């Protein structure tokens, strides 16, 4: 009878290890995905950071990279703890899972709280950037960011192409008679902005503001989806870790 119980204990222990090992693999992959999203945000979308002004957007990318790195490091620790069957390592692994889960929870709450604030900042700062800073001396980075924004999102002006009529750049001699910057043109050629006709200029309802807001919303949605996926995995992982730790403790005694 005792022999059967020992075999059953070994069977349960082996299956718990396999399940936790599989979880840890997907958890590690999830961490790599989180880090990849953060790096992608900084590399591919860094051209918009000078327009966004608020540090919230850039900070979110750095947080993703940090959390992703922490998840991957925790994953490596998890593999070692599972293979060695060390209770102390499993306890550390569980604590790290819990810390990461709490960080994700706090980040999710802050993202929800600050989204409206970020949206309001975008509306004010984008219009200010277009009218006051575009095309000005020592504002080459901002000018390049606005040009890229208008070409990538196929838009013109903050709310419409009419916003450019009051900009410092269009009213200056450097504009050379342009009604809008050349980056507003569907086909960019030299001085194409002199003719602000719908066949030549992007006339998008809501202008670049609507496009930029959608970009930020999609970015936060992607972060949220990845975060929720990793958080769900963590709950499963914490349960499996507790079960394996308890089984090892019972086996020891």
UniProtKB/Swiss-Prot annotation:
Pfam families on file: Tetraspanin
Annotated membrane-spanning segments are 19-39, 63-83, 93-113, 220-240
What keywords does the record list, in alphabetical order? Glycoprotein, Membrane, Transmembrane, Transmembrane helix
Task: Report the membrane topology from the UniProt record.
Answer: Multi-pass membrane protein
Q: Would the keyword Mitochondrion turn up in this protein's UniProt record?
A: no
What GO cellular-component annotations does this UniProt entry give? membrane
Q: Which residues are glycosylated?
A: 127
Q: Where in the cell is it found?
A: Membrane
InterPro entries associated with the record? Tetraspanin/Peripherin, Tetraspanin_animals, Tetraspanin_EC2_sf
Q: Which domain of life is it from?
A: Eukaryota
Q: Which family does it belong to?
A: Belongs to the tetraspanin (TM4SF) family.
Q: What is this protein called?
A: Tetraspanin-11
The organism is Mus musculus (Mouse)
Q: Its encoding gene is what?
A: Tspan11
